[in-house]
From Swiss-Prot:
Gene: Tex11
Transmembrane feature ranges: none
Protein name according to UniProt: Testis-expressed protein 11
The organism's place on the tree of life at top rank: Eukaryota
Source organism of this protein record: Mus musculus (Mouse)
Predominant location category: nucleus
Entry comment describing in which tissues the protein is expressed: Testis-specific.
Signal peptide: none
GO BP annotations listed: apoptotic process; chiasma assembly; ectopic germ cell programmed cell death; fertilization; male gonad development; male meiosis chromosome segregation; male meiotic nuclear division; meiotic gene conversion
Subcellular location(s) per record: Chromosome
Function according to Swiss-Prot or TrEMBL: Regulator of crossing-over during meiosis. Involved in initiation and/or maintenance of chromosome synapsis and formation of crossovers.
Alphabetically ordered keywords of this record: Chromosome, Meiosis
């Protein structure tokens, strides 16, 4: 084992050399992972032939390569961490002597570096292992240094070296503890570092920043109490050395601390927040600090005077006008309008330039409109427009701001359905455009006005406005939408369809969408959806149908497509259900089938894409499944359509949760579909088409068998014929297609313990139904059937007679004059059994007795022609036995049969050569032509009747 380990290590050593020499090998990641996995297999005892110096050399080379080449060779962080891990483990192998303080210091450095690599790759537990090793090495270093020093000065220097190392390790352990959620350990490490700052003052800023960053991370995770601790420590540590930590940084820390206290809520935290912001503003006055002070005062429900005084403090900072306006907006938004307006008057005295005064006036107008003080605002607007028209023109950005103010007010009016008010405010914006002669957003303004006119049912004004818009921006999606709405309101379906077609074309051509509309969540498809809603609301179903078809065709959103298909089907279904049978109804049903298939396709594409969509997908699948079922029921006069709808219903059911009701529906769908394809297969004009239909039926039968097996586990279905029907359907398909598995299938059927008579009856018929021809199967089925009939009490002589007739007809053909082809012993046994049944039961059909009598007589004649005298006499005597059981027909046959019997006996008594031509003719004269009065219907008809 040791030699195997040596071999692995030698291979490892060569690989390290190769890695260092070749640099970025294409197998770099594979090699690093292999080294990392195998390092645990190496220990000092196993490496008997490797010297310590060699191991140490490999470790140092690998370390240096990992550190220096990481950036150059794009070694990922986790790979670099693994390389450092390997190097450290090699250095720490048992038995390697630490000969100097430099060696221990190198180990400390390697441990700290490796721990940091693992910490920053997200594996804090491995990092802790190396930090602890570094701490142990620091203790060893301290002992070694104390043993080797001889002066007090040296002792101080050595202590400083060790303490600095301990400080760094503790800080990294704190970060690791935070990463693992161990706040207690992290805080203990930081407090130990804080205690060491008196001896390490140059580390103050480092620890201050560390605590600040830990506070930010805790606040991101909503751990406000932990965050407040770290930020508090950051401020206290920063105060310890004001030369290294600037007042701006201390103030920033306190502002964040105040914000954290504010988020905690409660009176106590409010007080702490207020104290923190006061100290922050004292450390370094900043607009953010003054603004935060106002927020805290607002939170504490301070009086208006306190708020105003806090606002006035900001004036000393000489900030831009926009900053002061944001303060006023903040006050107004928090229901302190009186303070806001008072402060607005104060700043208006401080900003005396014409541009600033105009900006303050527009802000005042906007504020008045937000607070619904419309009359005062309107007077100010008129003053602005009058001044703008005569002498005091506004700059471009102020003009745009005024437009935005007016449009904002109009938009708020539209939201509460005050369309006349909205038009009123839009009219001021229109006047401003007239004065300005600019055409920046005039088209958009006109469209907004069209929307209001339409809502007010003012069609003439809407048409006049949209005509101007159409001239300048005819392809804009909202231009088309308003033209569409006007057409619908006027009942112009042709014009509305033109717009819908234009929307479809723009979608198919991939015309670029307006960026502003996209950001607002409006697209051409959205407008198409709105057009559909508007058409339906106004009774234009034909237009809505066309638009819905385009939507389903072009949308990529499965929810939107399914919604469109549901809407389409809700429109068409009532009409289709009440239509008389016609080509038009057939066409409409075809449309519905296409819609269902489109829905099925969407379910197949998107059902498993996102779990969040599952609920609505399941509900929609169930809805479409039921619709397909109802359409199948409606199509009972068109078997192919009925089958198609049932199959779609089945496929849609696969996206619904299974229960007993759903399994019953699936069973019915597949059973009916198989029956329809079987029926069509029987009537198919060509063998090729027949085989195709029968194979399709077989696929459906197999699926139905699986469903049936699941369904039987959910309850008692002993009265359900599904199992029998599936057996017969599968048998018919296999016989008609000459399936090679038929033999195995039939063998399994014979072994079934609960075969019913009607199943065997149908199997016997189907086995001989063209193109099937399996007399052996029919023979066995009828034998089993006769046995079952005989066991019944009382015997059903009618069914028995039919089965016996068919069996004898199968065994003894009328036209074959060859005794060797008949199983006469079996036939004779069946005849005897029949005579026994006739004797013991009443009601055996006389026509069948006559038929058996004639068949027995003719077999006797056949036997005599072959010089089988005894057998001939026996068969003839059996014919007389059948004659004896006749009643009403006895008189018709008795004389003739007795005469024939006497003639036969005379011929047999002479014992002449029956094979002579003369004698053959005499025997043929004795044959009675069969009177097949008891024949049954064809197997094909029987099979159809069974379906």
């Amino acid at each position: 084992m040791d030699r195997i380990t040596d071999f692995y290590f030698l291979d490892f050593r060569e690989s390290v050399k190769t890695l260092i020499i070749t640099g970025n090998s294409w197998r770099l990641q594979e090699m690093i992972d292999r080294f990392f996995t195998n390092i645990s297999n190496f220990n000092r005892e196993s490496l008997t032939e490797i010297q310590n110096i060699q191991i140490e050399e490999i470790a140092v080379n690998l370390w240096n390569w990992a550190v220096t080449k990481r950036v150059e060779l794009s070694v990922r962080k986790n790979q670099a961490a693994k390389l450092c891990y390997i190097a450290c483990k090699l250095v720490y192998m048992h038995g390697i002597s630490v000969s100097s303080e430099e060696a221990i210091q190198r180990q400390i450095l390697m441990n700290i570096k490796t721990g940091k690599e693992w910490l920053y790759t997200g594996n804090a537990q491995i990092a802790d292992e190396f930090f602890q090793a570094a701490m142990t090495d620091l203790e060893r270093l301290y002992v070694r240094l104390m043993q080797s020093c001889y002066t007090e000065a040296n002792v101080c220097v050595y202590k400083m070296i060790v303490e600095k190392g301990i400080f760094h390790v503790l800080s990294y352990q704190a970060e690791s503890a935070v990463a693992q959620g161990d706040f207690k350990k992290a805080s203990m490490c930081v407090l130990r570092c804080k205690d060491m700052l008196m001896r390490l003052p140059n580390m103050t800023k480092y620890l201050h920043v560390l605590c600040y960053n830990l506070g930010i991370e805790a606040s991101k995770r909503n751990k406000y109490k932990e965050s407040s601790f770290w930020l508090g420590q950051s401020y206290e540590i920063g105060k310890m050395d004001r030369r290294s930590v600037e007042p701006q940084m201390l103030a920033k820390t306190l502002r964040l601390l105040a914000t954290i206290y504010l988020n905690c809520g409660g009176e106590a935290y409010y007080t702490k927040a207020f104290i923190a912001i006061l100290i922050a503003n004292k450390e370094h006055l900043h607009p953010a600090g003054l603004f935060l002070k106002m927020r805290i005062l607002m939170k504490g429900n301070s009086c208006n005077e306190e708020l105003l005084e806090a606002a006035k403090e900001i004036l000393y900072l000489a900030m831009p006008l926009e900053f002061y306006l944001s303060i006023i907006q903040f006050l107004i938004d928090n229901k302190r309008e009186s303070v806001g307006f008072r402060f607005l008057r104060i700043i208006s005295d401080n900003f005396k330039s014409p541009e600033d005064r105009k900006r303050i006036l527009l802000f005042y107008i906007d504020t008045l409109l937000q607070k619904d003080q419309d009359m005062i605002a309107e007077e100010k607007i008129k003053d602005v427009l009058k001044g703008y028209q005569t002498r005091s023109r506004l700059s471009r950005d102020l003009v745009n701001w005024l437009h935005n103010i007016l449009w904002g007010k109009a938009s708020r009016s539209v939201k509460v359905q005050k369309y006349a008010d909205a038009l009123h405010w839009y009219s001021y914006s229109l006047k401003l455009y007239e004065y300005d002669k600019a055409d920046l957003d005039l088209i958009k303004l006109k469209r907004n006005m069209v929307s209001c006119y339409l809502s007010l049912k003012q069609l003439d004004k809407a048409k006049e406005a949209i005509a101007e818009v159409e001239q300048k921006d005819p392809t804009h999606v909202f231009t088309r939408y308003y033209i569409f709405k006007i057409a619908i309101m006027e009942g112009d379906a042709f014009r509305a369809l033109q717009v819908v077609s234009a929307l479809k074309k723009s979608l198919m051509d991939g015309e670029s969408e307006d960026r502003g509309l996209i950001e607002a969540g409006v697209s051409t498809l959205t407008i198409l959806s709105l057009s559909i809603d508007f058409a339906l609301e106004n009774g234009q179903q034909f237009v809505a149908e066309r638009a819905l078809e385009y939507l389903c065709q072009l949308s990529k959103d499965p929810k939107e497509v399914l919604g469109g298909l549901k809407c389409l089907m809700r429109i068409i279904l009532p009409q289709a259900f009440h239509m008389p049978e016609s080509e038009y109804k057939k066409k409409e049903m075809g449309r519905l089938w296409n819609y269902l298939n489109t829905a099925l396709l969407k379910f197949s594409e998107y059902f498993n894409e996102a779990p969040s969509t599952l609920d609505y997908m399941v509900n929609d699948a169930n809805w479409f499944r039921k619709i397909a079922w109802n359409l199948a029921v409606q199509s009972e006069k068109d078997l192919e359509a009925m089958k198609n709808f049932f199959m779609v219903s089945y496929k849609l059911s696969l996206f619904c949760p299974l229960d007993q009701g759903l399994l019953i529906a699936q069973k019915t769908c597949l059973l009916v579909a198989a029956a329809v394809d079987l029926d069509r297969g029987r009537k198919a004009p060509t063998i090729c088409e027949q085989n195709m239909l029968l194979r399709t039926a077989l696929e459906q039968i197999k699926k139905c068998k699986k469903v049936w097996n699941l369904l039987k586990k959910t309850g008692d279905f002993s009265g359900d014929d599904c199992g029998v029907l599936l057996l017969l359907y599968e048998f018919e398909v296999k016989t008609k297609t000459n399936d090679p598995s038929l033999s195995r299938f039939v063998d399994s059927v014979w072994k079934m313990p609960d075969l019913e008579c009607r199943t065997l009856e149908t199997m016997a018929l189907l086995a001989m139904d063209k193109p099937a021809y399996y007399p052996t199967i029919a023979h066995k089925a009828m034998k089993k059937l006769l046995l079952m009939y005989r066991k019944q009490e009382p015997v059903d002589v009618l069914k028995y007679s039919v089965c016996m007739h068919n069996l004898i007809k199968l065994l003894v053909a009328d036209e074959v004059w060859n005794i060797s082809l008949y199983p006469l012993k079996e036939v004779q046994s069946h005849f005897k059994n029949t005579l026994s049944i006739i004797r013991q039961n009443e009601g055996y059909p006389e026509e069948e007795i006559v038929w058996l009598m004639i068949k027995s007589w003719n077999i006797g004649i056949l036997m005599s022609s072959k010089n089988k005298y005894i057998s001939a006499e026996r068969w003839a005597a059996m014919a007389l036995d059948f004659l004896g059981h006749l009643s009403t027909l006895k008189t018709s046959y008795e004389a003739k049969v007795n005469l024939l019997y006497a003639n036969l006996m005379e011929i047999l008594d002479k014992k002449t050569d029956l094979r002579s031509t003369e004698m053959t003719e005499q025997l043929r004269a004795l044959i009675v032509p069969p009177e097949d009065q008891g024949s049954v219907s064809s197997t094909n008809v029987a099979a159809q009747n069974h379906l």
